Amino acid sequence: SNRHQDQVCLIGAKDSYHSTYSQVCEVAVPDARFNDKDQLTYQPVPFATLLDGLRDSFSAALDCEPVAEDYALSNQGQELYGMMTWRLPESEHSGLALALRSSYNSSIAPAFGVGEAVFVCANGSFSVDGMIKSARQTTNVMETLRELTRDVSSTAISDFRAMAEETAGWRDVAVKDDLFYAYCGLLFGRKVISSQLFSTAIKYWNACRDGSLHREHATENLWSAYQAVTAAMQRSGPRDSFRGYGGLHHVTRAVFNSGGCVEGSSQIPSLDVEAAMRVATN
């Protein structure tokens, strides 16, 4: 599996460091704060409570334990960033990843998001191709988090399973170099990826093809094309990839609908992104 998908990034995050679960749990939990009327204004969620709650809830809903957990602490241990990944029977090639962040210094409310491609960085960057939920650390924050977790674990898992089913078919669609360049061009033109990501995706595709990078992404098919773009998106650590991942799906679906390259030919088939978008919104 791609190790960078299961790791928390430290790019541009000074004084941050990778941490074990026990190191995260050792950080002292600050006291709750009250105003002069004795009303609760800040109720910290212990990092251990957040992690255990998310892990238990998702593991129960998925009926399996996570295969990887990665954490980073920043700002003298006051900010937490992490990722948990589960492998599901529906998809041997991709995991369901949960990215999370929280803090003890009021800088970040506890938030988590799930999807097939997620990115979390200790500099605050956070992007998910699924949904993100956040809870302010005030009254009832624990109950709010419990409700959010229940809601997300059930919805996200059914979304992921549908997605895994769809992407499985992408391996049967041939994508030659020229179609991949056209695919990236559409993504760039539609503002799904930047010019820098365009260039990174092409480099990733070429590196996989010449054997210097992931062998399993070297096959000339739509799955490898999609992986090249998500790898580029993850490496850049975009702050807001919601629009990005949504747009990526529409364009990928358009390539799938075209049938891809015909065997023995590198001709680019006609692509109808608008039709793929209409299907997605119906």
Give the ranges of each region predicted by the language model:
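A short acidic/basic microdomain associated with nuclease active sites
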Residues: 59-86
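Residues at beta-strand starts and edge strands
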Residues: 46, 78-80, 94
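Intrinsically disordered, low-complexity regions enriched in serine/threonine
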Residues: 1-8, 13, 71-72, 87-282
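Feature for intrinsically disordered/low-complexity regulatory segments and propeptides
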Residues: 1-53, 57-63
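Intrinsic-disorder/low-complexity coil detector
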Residues: 29, 43-45, 65, 88, ...
